[in-house]
């Protein structure tokens, strides 16, 4: 993505950033105290043996969040529940900051408070809640903002960094007609981040690898092999993290260290277990991104970076619909996490497009028509639903 001249953030922007950080940290901290997934992960954090990294990895092959929590417990001498809330709250704030910086770097002419405000909305929205369709706001629907699962919270800022970095590579490749190599520094950074994402939760690479592969195959066909060199470079960038993911897969499913019975193909069994209609649930989750991709396509503003996000969503949907764990863990939905991360990235591109079309220097107030009104109305529905989801978790005591 090309860097553009940015407007200074200004006092209003900094105030909005500060308010957003306080809101998101508080939400992350409070939901950590009630989230049902936290208990087992907190016990793992307390049981870690950092002095034996090999044994630690064999016992817990995705230890990133647990190591952070362990470190906070030792540093602050606090209860593990407090440490968990601090770590998750800070990770959510980090995701917000990364989104803010990357949006400002890629969309010209945005005021700081505009980006800060819409960035906050991005990190509060959920699927549109329709009680008579599905009584629970998350189960069966999904959300771009997972509050109750610490490892998903841990991998999300890493996933966003990788996406922003690789999307910039993809756009540059196409712009330069595949005549130049991927910058070595960017490739190394992305490769290291991919390894870190596996150590946080391998769900992201499960959608990233097939998406980038699919894009390269599409380009090989469209451009008659011109992108082959860049495709090989991307493959080499992914190999170290792929090795880590394979090792994690073997430990998780076939080493006897877990209670998983392996993987099975179970079409629609898990995805359809808690919803009357998978298709309607997806529409309620993706109404705003779908509308924005249509509006952006009409304006001819779609980028190959946007396409990469939607390809990740495609593969996330495939894994979610088809795969499950055998035995008692079948309905844990562990092949849904990659889908949720892809949903977040599609939402990120949608909010960025919304800012670009209706708030950047390219647009003025008198150019906001029916599309703006409709998109804003749908976004408000998602926001209200997201706020209710937080109330459902924290105030009503449904920690999922």
Describe these PLM feature segments:
Residues 1-26, 111-120:
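Start-transfer (signal-anchor) and selected internal transmembrane alpha helices
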Residues 10-14, 112-119, 182-186, 229-238, ...:
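Membrane-interfacial loop-to-transmembrane alpha-helix junctions, especially the N-terminal start
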Residues 31-40, 47-50, 61-63, 202-207, ...:
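Transmembrane catalytic cores of multi-pass membrane glycosyltransferases
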Residues 40-47, 53-82:
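Short hydrophobic/aromatic helix or loop-helix immediately within or flanking a transmembrane segment
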Residues 83-112, 161:
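Transmembrane-helix motifs of polytopic, lipid-linked glycan transferases
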Residues 115-170, 278-281, 333-343:
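Membrane-interface micro-motifs in multi-pass membrane enzymes
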Residues 186-202, 208:
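Membrane-interface alpha helices of multi-pass inner-membrane proteins
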Residues 206, 328-356:
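Hydrophobic/aromatic-rich transmembrane helices and adjacent perimembrane loops
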């Amino acid at each position: 993505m090309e860097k553009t001249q940015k407007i200074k953030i200004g006092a209003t922007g900094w105030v909005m950033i500060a308010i957003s950080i306080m809101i998101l940290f508080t939400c992350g901290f409070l939901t950590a105290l009630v989230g049902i997934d936290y208990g087992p992960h907190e016990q793992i954090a307390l049981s870690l043996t950092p002095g034996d990294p090999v044994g630690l990895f064999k016992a817990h092959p995705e230890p990133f969040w647990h190591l952070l929590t362990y470190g906070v417990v030792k540093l602050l001498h606090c209860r593990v529940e407090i440490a968990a809330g601090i770590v998750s709250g800070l990770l959510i704030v980090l995701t917000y900051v990364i989104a803010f910086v990357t949006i400002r770097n890629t969309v010209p002419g945005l005021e700081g408070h505009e980006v800060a405000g819409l960035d906050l909305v991005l990190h509060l929205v959920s699927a549109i809640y329709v009680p008579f369709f599905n009584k629970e706001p998350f189960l069966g629907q999904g959300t771009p903002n997972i509050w109750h699962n610490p490892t998903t919270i841990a991998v999300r800022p890493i996933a966003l960094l990788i996406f922003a970095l690789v999307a910039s590579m993809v756009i540059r490749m196409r712009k330069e007609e595949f005549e130049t190599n991927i910058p070595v520094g960017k490739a190394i950074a992305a490769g290291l981040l991919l390894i870190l994402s596996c150590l946080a939760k391998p769900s992201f690479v499960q959608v990233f690898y097939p998406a980038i592969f699919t894009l390269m195959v599409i380009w090989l066909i469209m451009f008659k092999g011109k992108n082959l060199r860049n495709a090989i470079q991307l493959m080499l960038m992914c190999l170290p993290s792929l090795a880590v993911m394979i090792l994690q897969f073997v430990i998780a499913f076939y080493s006897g260290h877990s209670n998983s019975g392996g993987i099975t193909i179970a079409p629609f069994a898990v995805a359809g277990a808690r919803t009357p209609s998978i298709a309607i649930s997806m529409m309620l989750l993706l109404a705003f991104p779908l509308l924005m991709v249509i509006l952006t396509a009409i304006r001819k503003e779609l980028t190959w970076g946007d396409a990469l996000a939607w390809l990740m969503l495609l593969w996330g949907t495939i894994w979610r619909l088809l795969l499950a764990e055998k035995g008692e863990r079948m309905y844990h939905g562990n092949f849904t996490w990659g889908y949720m991360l892809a949903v977040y990235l599609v939402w990120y591109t949608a909010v960025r497009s919304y800012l670009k079309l209706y708030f950047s220097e390219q647009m003025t107030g008198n150019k906001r028509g029916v599309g703006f009104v409709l998109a804003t109305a749908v976004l408000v529905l998602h926001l209200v639903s997201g706020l209710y989801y937080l109330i459902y978790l924290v105030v009503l005591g449904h920690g999922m």
